[in-house]
């Protein structure tokens, strides 16, 4: 019986395959299979895999046209026969030699749908380093055997440091979306919102080769990748919000804002046009000023159910608006109108803040605000008329 099927998408990984397969062969759990999904590699990866399959009897090779790692992982899951599913990228490693065995035994004992472990970073010279995500509390470090709720996991990152019961994934039809970038958090968000509890083990399963994988910026480097990466945020937010995973969702929204404020991203007009297209359905005007785009996005992402993140976003917007005002930078009335709408919807009175009250008065007395008054009045009147018609029909 195959206890764990390890899924490994392979695209032009000829430099790493021998080392990665050797690393996996050292795991103390021997009842495993490694499903290598060759994703249309154009280098010597397939030939190397075939030689490795002769050497290691646990290797199975699947070939597909180049469709991306998400589709490759789905293909691997469909062809897996193991009780549990694990994931491994061609340039990464498993750290503790008994990690899979510990996780399988604990998961099997408790009939767990998901078993979590810990992760290390692999430096450019191959040394293991601590994972900074634990210090930043992006997700939880497991210091002992135990059980946690899915809400305690943290933001849906590092899916590969966990194993998942295959029958659970099939039952809930959980797969990777067909995105060029960002498919991993969508997959893990689906898991977290479907699983009842997570069994955790104090072991280092995964070694992520950060030097080779790079950060998001190095991977999101053309229009389609940027589009998919921003879409993954929207998809993940919806999954989490629909399941009332408010705290995790809002924490991930903060990650998006932080990402967009990075120096390299602030100067990427193409990226912000994509952000505007995906997130700002109620605003047809693209703001040429990056700060205005970020402010409007923050207002679109506000969710009052989580007080901490709501306060974070509102205070961020408020301080940016006030800073623009005292520096004599004209504030777009569309942004301030959205700000007042958010405050009104959350029963927060802007009049309790003298500075913002003054700013509101200045904007409402400005020429740009007065010039757009007929448009706003017409829009409001149209909405009222439509509501009356709807009520009569009902």
List the predicted regions and their residue ranges.
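Short, well-formed alpha-helical segments that are part of the catalytic scaffolds
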Residues: 12-26
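Conserved short acidic donor-positioning loop in nucleotide-sugar-dependent glycosyltransferases
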Residues: 24, 39-40, 67, 90
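A conserved acidic beta->alpha catalytic loop
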Residues: 38-47
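Glycine-rich, basic loop-to-helix element that forms the pyrophosphate-binding segment
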Residues: 64-80, 90
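Donor-binding/catalytic cores of nucleotide-activated saccharide
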Residues: 69, 90-201, 206-224, 265-266, ...
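Short aromatic/hydrophobic "clamp" motif used to bind/position activated sugar donors
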Residues: 85
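Boundary detector for helix-to-coil junctions that initiate low-complexity/charged tails
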Residues: 315-394
